Amino acid sequence: MWDSSYMQQVSEGLMTGKVPIDQVFGANPSEKLHKRRKPKGTVGLQCSPCLMSKATSTDDIVWDQLIVKKTLADLLIPINRQISDIQSTLNEVTTRVHEIERQLHEITPVLKMGRTLEAISKGMSEMLAKYDHLVISTGRTTAPAAAFDAYLNEHGVPPPQPAIFKDLGVAQQACSKGTMVKNETTDAADKMSKVLELSEETFSKPNLSAKDLALLLFTHLPGNNTPFHILAQVLSKIAYKSGKSGAFLDAFHQILSEGENAQAALTRLSRTFDAFLGVVPPVIRVKNFQTVPRPCQKSLRAVPPNPTIDKGWVCVYSSEQGETRALKI
């Protein structure tokens, strides 16, 4: 331990000059003070070669890490720029999507109205087609059969106005033997036999004649005597013979309601309707090919080995010279 009295004497000696400074601190008192205050591990400590090599390798690692960080920073700069561009593009796309959604909400009522109009148009076309084939009569068409028979028995002649209805009494009078019936009654019975009895099936799909069906199709076709007019006649005749004229007309109107034109509807039906699959086209005899309608002359082709309607062959023209040409659509 330090002696406090001794240290006090030394301090007093130094302050009064009785004790020289060199005697206490040596020749260079600041050298010991410098050495005492000098931090450890700078010059006083010598590093071994092993530690020096480790320090050098650590510096290299730190330098490599700095280079890697700088490289990564250089790479991240364009990536950040691209991400910002993508973000701005996404914002624009989101804005446009919201705008489209708003427009769709505005268009929805118009689309519903379009579907309603399409359904109304389809229903009206079917009603018009059926209306053309309903029996239209005037006069006493609502008179009951009893009133008709009473008038006939009283006056001996039927009512002056036409009365077309299904009356068993008139039919029996017209067909019974030994009964003299007036010509008017006979005509009424003939008309009644020709009237199509309306039912749920016959009203929805009336069995039209080939001529009436072709005339209906002609109203949708532009021009005259085109290959599609010939196709309409051929398809109408085949549909009538197969008893599917009503179904064919309904399918035709269905395709028209989808937005197709009459030519496309006839072409599709000729290749998909079951009554036309595998059917051989009819042979039409002509004097020469100059008598073929002019719009059809450019569509004449050589007759293939097995022509069918579902493959686009409408008919085959045969001239008096024995030559044949097929009409192709």
From Swiss-Prot:
* Cellular location(s): Virion; Host cytoplasm
User: Which positions fall inside the VP35 IID domain?
Assistant: 204-329
Q: Give start-end ranges for the coiled-coil region(s).
A: 70-120
Query: Which CDD domains does the entry link to?
Result: V35-RBD_P-protein-C_like
Q: Name one GO cellular component term.
A: virion component
Stated role: Plays an essential role in viral RNA synthesis and also a role in suppressing innate immune signaling.
**Claim: Nucleotidyltransferase is one of the keywords in the record:** no
What is the designated name of this protein?
A: Polymerase cofactor VP35
Q: Keyword set for this entry?
A: Coiled coil, Host cytoplasm, Transcription, Viral RNA replication, Virion
Keyword check for Aminoacyl-tRNA synthetase: no
- Provide the assembly information: Homooligomer. Homomultimerization via the coiled coil domain is a prerequisite for binding to L. Found in a trimeric complex in which VP35 bridges L and the nucleoprotein. Interacts with NP. Disrupts innate immune signaling in infected host cell.
What family is this protein classified in? Belongs to the filoviridae polymerase cofactor VP35 family.
Q: What domain of life does the UniProt record list for this protein's source?
A: Viruses
